[in-house]
UniProtKB/Swiss-Prot annotation:
Residues 479-491 have a biased composition (Polar residues). Keywords: Isopeptide bond, Metal-binding, Nucleus, Phosphoprotein, Repeat, Ubl conjugation, Zinc, Zinc-finger. A zinc finger (CCHC-type) spans 241-258, 263-280, 304-321, 348-365. Residues 59-68 have a biased composition (Low complexity). Residues 51-71, 414-543 are annotated as: Disordered. This is Zinc finger CCHC domain-containing protein 7. It is found in: Nucleus, Nucleolus. It comes from Homo sapiens (Human). Residues 441-457, 465-475, 503-515 have a biased composition (Basic and acidic residues). Its main location: nucleus.
Length: 543
């Protein structure tokens, strides 16, 4: 009662899916598989049938048995026809071993009628059986095909009969025709199943015709990529990828829908031209752009030998080995050395002459292609001392370039730029910064030295003045200090004055008049201290 009154699950499935054939007999599916595996694709069946009829007539009338009831018929399979198997004496046996099968047709008269139009349409869409079955099958007349349904019987060939059949049919049988076998290299061609090829393009040695289908020509199938970009992809885009063209995440630059950017020149960083058409290329001997008025300050190095790689054409500081020695370094500091030194491989090929046994920098014909070759190997790795020495040499070269005006100096008025950027900029600070940046930083030390020299010179000058005063007045000058000012008073002069002290008022300049007033004030201070009566009387007379 498990299957609703059915004895087995097979009977239940037959009733469920309305399968008329018994599910116990698994021969139906196997026969169908065998039939479809032996089908050949045919073109122009009318011409093929005519050729077969002509061959059969020439072979003789003894083999023809068109009037007999057990006559062999051409099996034609189409979508409209139905293949029926007899329930009587037909026996189908299959073998596990690889064997050649024979197909035999058996006529059974059935009360069925087919019109001529259905027959003609079925013939055009039919498919033929294997070539080895065609040799044993004869062509029936068109009148007899209308009321005949074929039966197919597959019989296993014994080992003794198999040897005989392979002798006669071995020429036409290929390995791919056998069930369970794969395509062998010994097969004649790949179009063994194709029959009736008239529109041949080329004809090979064996007379094999190659044809092109009209449908393929109309479809214009080609293995070419479309010129447009693939904007939609069949897999999920990686969100971590950044496009170099539009700087957005999710796609690569080759799949970017936007137009590509114009490439920059890596010499002048400008767009619109590349390296070879750059208006300001670098000098071959100094790392400075080559202008119209460029005069190289360094010596030519085309005939100089590098002390590092021992190659001609460059100096030691310009050797490519300096940056190639960092191929294992991932942290700042001296380059990391490999544990085992690398050796050149035995298979060496030249990129100039394409010969085996040497590299491009060792090529005897390199003067034609590359007059200044470079070694691809690393001779030795630098240490800290060598790196520091190289940096010192580079700094000296930079100083030479600055003195000659090759490297542009900073702007003379940097506070103007700062004021434009900062609207609340202080002018005093700007002036101070302008004074500090008025001269290059290299001359700051010289400025300090000049200031110190000026100060020392002023000190020596004052000391010399005091010495002259001491020689003229051995008793020493008398100094008077006024509040808020610190001035050195001149020494008092003796009573007897020489003639050169007396000058006329007309000859005195306005500056000398000011000095005279100061002298009178000093004399007043001196008279208060002196008790000489003679001097007091003399002053009264002058006043």
């Amino acid at each position: 009662m498990m299957f609703g009154g059915y004895e087995t699950i097979e009977a239940y499935e037959d009733d469920l899916y309305r399968d008329e054939s018994s599910s116990e007999l698994s021969v139906d599916s196997e026969v169908e598989f065998q039939l479809y595996s032996q089908i050949h694709y045919a073109q122009d069946l009318d011409d093929v049938i005519r050729e077969e009829e002509h061959e059969e007539k020439n072979s003789g009338n003894s083999e023809s048995s068109s009037s007999k009831p057990n006559q062999k018929k051409l099996i034609v399979l189409s979508d409209s026809e139905v293949i029926q198997l007899s329930d009587g004496s037909e026996v189908i046996t299959l073998s596990d071993e690889d064997s050649i099968y024979r197909c035999k047709g058996k006529n059974v008269r059935v009360q069925a009628q087919e019109n001529a139009h259905g027959l003609s349409s079925s013939l055009q869409s039919n498919e033929l059986v294997d070539k080895k079955c065609k040799s044993d099958i004869e062509k029936p007349k068109s009148e007899e095909r209308s009321g005949v349904i074929r039966e197919v019987m597959i019989i296993e060939v014994s080992s003794s009969e198999e040897e005989e059949s392979t002798i006669s049919e071995g020429d036409n049988v290929e390995s791919w025709m056998l069930l369970g076998c794969e395509v062998d290299d010994k097969d004649d061609d790949i179009l063994l199943n194709l029959v009736g090829c008239e529109n041949s393009v080329t004809e090979g040695e064996d007379g094999i015709n190659w044809s092109i289908s009209d449908k393929d020509i109309e479809a214009q199938i080609a293995n070419n990529r479309t010129p447009g970009r693939w904007t939609q992809r069949y897999y999920s885009a990686n969100k971590n990828i950044i496009c170099r063209n539009c700087d957005k995440r999710g796609h690569l630059s080759k799949n970017c829908p936007l137009p590509r950017k114009v490439r920059r020149c890596f010499l002048c960083s400008r767009r619109g031209h590349l390296l070879y058409s750059c208006p300001a290329p670098l000098c071959e001997y100094c790392p400075v752009p080559k202008m119209l008025d460029h005069s190289c300050l360094f010596r030519h190095s085309w005939d100089k030998q590098c002390d590092r790689c021992h190659m001609l054409g460059h100096y030691t500081d310009a050797c490519t080995e300096i940056w190639r020695q960092y191929h294992l370094t991932t942290k700042p500091g001296p380059p990391k050395k490999p544990k085992t030194p690398s050796r050149p491989s035995a298979l060496a090929y030249c990129y100039h002459c394409a010969q085996k046994g040497h590299y491009g920098h060792e090529c005897p014909e390199r003067e034609v292609y590359d007059p200044s070759p470079v070694s691809p190997f690393i001779c030795y790795y630098d240490d800290k001392y060598e790196i520091q020495e190289r940096e010192k040499r580079l700094k000296q070269k930079i100083k030479v370039l600055k003195k000659n005006g090759v490297i542009p100096e900073p702007s003379k008025l940097p506070y103007i730029k700062a004021a434009n950027e900062n609207p609340h900029h202080d002018i005093r600070k700007g002036r101070a910064s302008w004074k500090s940046n008025r001269w290059p930083q290299e001359n700051k030390e010289t400025q300090k030295e000049m200031k110190n020299k000026n100060r020392n010179w002023e000190k020596h000058r004052k000391a010399d003045r005091h010495r002259e005063v001491d020689e003229d007045f051995p008793r020493g000058p008398k100094t008077y200090s006024s509040p808020g000012s610190f001035k050195t008073q001149k020494p008092s002069k003796p009573f007897h004055r020489s003639s050169h002290y007396h000058t006329s008022r007309e000859d005195k300049s306005p500056k000398e008049g000011k000095r005279g007033k100061q002298k009178k004030k000093e004399r007043c201070w001196e008279d208060d201290d002196n008790d000489n009566l003679f001097l007091i009387k003399q002053r009264k007379k002058k006043s």
